[in-house]
Amino acid sequence: MQENRPVIALDFPEFSDVKDFLEKFDPSEKLYIKLGMELFYTAGPQVVYYVKSLGHSVFLDLKLHDIPNTVESSMRVLARLGVDMVNVHAAGGVEMMVAAKRGLEAGTPIGRQRPKLIAVTQLTSTSEEIMQNDQKIMTSLEESVINYAQKTAQAGLDGVVCSAHEVEKIKAATSKEFICLTPGIRPEGASKGDQKRVMTPKEARTIGSDYIVVGRPITQAKDPVSAYHAIKEEWNQ
């Protein structure tokens, strides 16, 4: 099922930046917010509690990648924060991903729904050249992504983070219900920034993405609210 709200990546360095940004929106409008490493390492759980207190959904983007026991324990803690989605690196392996889900289930308070758990396949900043030269994965980028997606499904996770260009083949290799969350989304004419594999909101919708993540085209816009609504409208066409 496709989420009708673009996920806004609040890649800010300070808690105060989050407050300033969210205050621009009408309090009645409920957003889907991605909180990343820098912000969480700076502000800690309080930034999650604050965003949730305003009624917004939270994707806590920490990309856990460690030994299974450590990831399981960490997920047990993150589940208590009330977030709606968390992620791990698929490169950690099936055992680690299974442990992550187990920890998430154990930590979710009674009466609450377990946060969705997705895995990163290859970062959208990774090119095939980088993958082959630096990671020494001597297949195509697409084959690597699909392999990671299949391992993620095997582990029982809800979906993956992937480029919109890979959505159709990932769903064919897993299932239609398997979530594909796609960063690297840019409105027509926007700068690609450090993203190597990008797509517009309309293209991502057409190709079957379930969630899209948009950061700088919204957060660095002169009018972030208008920019968000324009992207949301394009996403829901």
From Swiss-Prot:
Pfam families referenced in this protein's UniProt entry, alphabetically: OMPdecase
Any GO BP: 'de novo' UMP biosynthetic process
Residue numbers binding substrate: 11, 34, 61-70, 124, 186, 195, 215-216
InterPro entries: Aldolase_TIM, OMPdecase, OMPdecase_AS, OMPdecase_bac, OMPdeCOase_dom, RibuloseP-bd_barrel
Active site feature: 63
Signal peptide residues on this chain, from the entry's feature table: none
Reaction catalyzed: orotidine 5'-phosphate + H(+) = UMP + CO2
EC number: 4.1.1.23
Record's keyword annotation contains Secreted: no
Family classification: Belongs to the OMP decarboxylase family. Type 1 subfamily.
Function: Catalyzes the decarboxylation of orotidine 5'-monophosphate (OMP) to uridine 5'-monophosphate (UMP).
Gene: pyrF
Recorded GO MF terms: orotidine-5'-phosphate decarboxylase activity
Subunit structure: Homodimer.
Enzyme class: lyase
Keywords: Decarboxylase, Lyase, Pyrimidine biosynthesis
Assigned GO CC terms: cytosol
Protein name, per record: Orotidine 5'-phosphate decarboxylase
CDD domains the UniProt entry points to: OMP_decarboxylase_like
Taxonomy, superkingdom: Bacteria
Pathway annotation: Pyrimidine metabolism; UMP biosynthesis via de novo pathway; UMP from orotate: step 2/2
